[in-house]
Amino acid sequence: IQSTNPTVLQHHLIHNTSPLEMPSVRQLWLIFVIGTLVSSVFMAPILVTSVNAVTLLLFFIVALPAWIIGFSTPVFAWWSTSNEYFGLSTTRKQGEWMLVAGMLSTLPALLINSLISPIIINLLGLSVTDEYSLGFGMILFLSAPIGEEISKALAVLCLARFIDSSKRGFQIGFSVGLGFALLENMTYILNSLLIGEGAAISFVFTAVLRAVGSIPGHATWTAISGYAIGKYVVNRRSNNLTEKSYTDTKSSSDSQWILFDNKSGLPIISSKTRKLPNLPSWLSAGQQKMVRITGNPVIAVAIAIIFHAIWNGSLWSISVLMKDSSIIVQLLTNMTMIFLLILILWIILRRLIPFALLTD
């Protein structure tokens, strides 16, 4: 820099505090619905007609976009739901950390489910190769819930610096669960596309059922753990730090800003403004029907494990009981159980959200 006058150059580094901005919930669900329907239409010729160059070309054209839409858009739709309705100011940096932490938590869970648990079960004399065997079932209703819920809870704990309330812990747990579901969903959607001639049907069923079932399930179970971890972190922080040091820490990590009206000069909104959650009826059953969430992290993680175990164990038990039945009976029974589990999940979620967000 050249100047005729003495010049002092100062470079200020500030944290990026831009808010998390996402497409609306309606837009994301619309993309998901249209994308899955169009993809299934393009894959239908393989199911209806014989495999030939034209049907294979149609399949390969739509396979990659179908996979991306199928595994990602429902996760981001639920993420947008939490960002839009939970009433918590979230920066883009915080949102990215939450999702990435959930994705990283799949690594220890995968290690437990794929390596450690099979070795232990084999040492007990049980087989894990037969899907109807007790050993295989133990992977589903014991190993997976324990390994996955503990891994996700530890991911929430790693984000303790973002936690300023139990409500924030609930939000972080919800987002971490979505990050975990994102990577898990990649595998399930890919498998549904590689099934062969029935890909058009398996893709739609897998994408839709996971969008309204497994994805919010992971988010809900981890949100329970996150709420308790949030309460624990806040209580421990207030007990261990003096009021001054806590204030200094908070002021150094939070940006202070005020937005003024350019005409009147009056303040419109500031960093201290707290938005009240505006919960729609489909997401909240109201404060009259809310269910309390424990503030003990150990109990909360145990509850998450139990819910997860019931989900996996119910589906596995039905498949074992119906293994000698016809394909039609097996399909109807499994679908009935899935719809029942989804209904129970939604009843629980709609009663947990008002407690976590409206009573903190």
Regions found by a protein language model. Give the residues of each.
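Hydrophobic alpha-helical segments at protein termini of multi-pass membrane proteins
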Residues: I1-D360
